[in-house]
Amino acid sequence: MLTVALLALLCASASGNAIQARSSSYSGEYGGGGGKRFSHSGNQLDGPITALRVRVNTYYIVGLQVRYGKVWSDYVGGRNGDLEEIFLHPGESVIQVSGKYKWYLKKLVFVTDKGRYLSFGKDSGTSFNAVPLHPNTVLRFISGRSGSLIDAIGLHWDVYPSSCSRC
C-alpha cells in the first residue's frame, strides 16, 4: 500500500512539473566573434525596458545603453558617433528585434507591441530577426560582446513583470 501511495505521489509531482508553462527564451548571439562579454541580466530586476540609447557612426552600432524601470544600465561600446535616445510609452514592450551584422553590429530595429519601429544604424550586412519562442513574452534584457563597437548582441525574452515598485 505504501508503495502505491509513493508511486501516485511521484506521478502527480512529475505531471505537475510537466504542465508548468515555460516563458523564457533566448535569441542570438548575432554579430562577430570579438569584444568583451556583457550582460544586463541583473538589470531586469529594476523593471521592464523603458528606454534605449544607441550610439551609431557611419557604418556600425557603436554603443548601447538600456533603461530598466527608472535605472540606466552601464553603457557598453565605444564613444565615437551620434547618440540616439528613445523612450517607450508606459506599458509598451519590445516584442521583436531585427538587424544586420558582419564582423560588428550594423543595424538594430526594435519593434514594440504598440506598432512602433525604432530603427538605428545602416542597412547592410547579414540579416537577423529575433522573436520570443513563447507567447505573451517580451524583451527583458540584452547581452553580447563589445569593444570600441558592439561586436554582437543576444536577446533574452520573458513575461512582462507583473509589478514593479521602482518603475
Swiss-Prot record:
Residues 1-16 form the signal peptide. It comes from the Eukaryota. Its main location: secreted. One of its GO terms (molecular function) is carbohydrate binding. Keywords: Cytoplasmic vesicle, Extracellular matrix, Golgi apparatus, Lectin, Protein transport, Secreted, Signal, Transport. It holds the Pfam family Jacalin. Highly expressed in liver. Detected at lower levels in colon, ileum and jejunum. GO terms for biological process: defense response to Gram-positive bacterium; protein transport; suppression of symbiont entry into host. Residues 24-159 form the Jacalin-type lectin domain. It is found in: Secreted, Extracellular space, Extracellular matrix; Zymogen granule lumen; Golgi apparatus lumen. One of its GO terms (cellular component) is collagen-containing extracellular matrix. SMART domains: Jacalin. Belongs to the jacalin lectin family. May play a role in protein trafficking. May act as a linker molecule between the submembranous matrix on the luminal side of zymogen granule membrane (ZGM) and aggregated secretory proteins during granule formation in the TGN. This is Zymogen granule membrane protein 16. It comes from Homo sapiens (Human).
